[in-house]
A protein has these predicted regions:
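A contiguous, mid-domain pocket- or channel-lining segment that forms the substrate-recognition surface
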Residues: 95
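Active-site nucleotide-donor binding segment shared across nucleotidyl transfer reactions
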Residues: 1-9, 13-20, 171, 198-199
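A short secondary-structure junction signal
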Residues: 86-92
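Short, conserved acidic/polar surface loops in the N-terminal third of protein domains
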Residues: 23-24, 89
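Conserved catalytic core of two-metal-ion nucleotidyltransferases
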Residues: 25-85, 105-199, 204
Length: 204
């Protein structure tokens, strides 16, 4: 069931499907009931991932309390990306950090004084919100250029600095198993246990 300290459901999608979700949403979804939100040049939502919100509910998160966006019970959707090796991996993580900073547009906290100072400096260099989004989107293109089928590992680049370090064997996502969740049968990655141990350690 739900963890008592969490307030939403997290869903993974391969990068190509993740991008198609946002593009196809206006055509196929019940847009009166549900909103699909992602920061663009025209809309700032304060997240570095996509959020699907139930418009018939209210759930306001403190960092977003002043934003003019639908704020309700949400599903957070994260892309899965191919994970290269060597210098390409280092550059991928650098671009993921740039993406995260300029899309969230918030000084990093809880990562040490150096990261906080560098984040504040980088945001100060580009003060306009639209310019920050443009820089973030350019970094997103660079970090997501590696296809899953061309790599031996998978990573998650839109879940924050800690998780972008993780490298998951592709076998974790090679198939699907179904498990009961709150009375519903839900699909999970076949290697969910290995994934959870890499992401959270002794998660039980």
């Amino acid at each position: 069931g739900f963890n008592p300290w969490d307030d939403d459901i997290d869903v993974f999608m391969p990068r190509d499907d993740y991008e198609r979700l946002f593009e196809l949403w206006p055509k196929y979804a019940d847009t009166e009931r549900y909103s699909c939100l992602k920061t663009t040049k025209d809309k700032f939502i304060g997240n570095i991932f996509t959020t699907i919100v139930d418009n018939n509910t209210t759930c306001i998160k403190p960092p977003q309390k002043d934003l003019d966006i639908p704020q309700g019970i949400a599903i957070d959707v994260f892309p899965l990306d191919g994970c290269p090796i060597g210098i390409k991996r280092k550059m991928q993580k650098l671009n993921a950090l740039i993406y995260s900073l300029y899309i969230a547009q918030e000084i990093p906290k809880n990562h040490g004084p150096l990261v906080t100072a560098v984040g504040a400096l980088m945001l100060g260099i580009i003060p306009m919100r639209s310019w920050r989004v443009a820089v973030g989107k350019a970094a997103e293109k660079r970090m997501s250029r590696y296809k899953i089928e061309d790599c031996d590992f998978i990573t998650e680049l839109c879940a924050g600095p800690h998780y972008m370090q993780n490298e998951y064997p592709k076998r974790c996502f090679d198939g699907v198993v179904r498990k009961n969740f709150e009375g519903y049968e839900m699909p999970l990655p076949a290697g969910y246990d290995e994934y959870l141990h890499i992401a959270f350690g002794d998660y039980m």
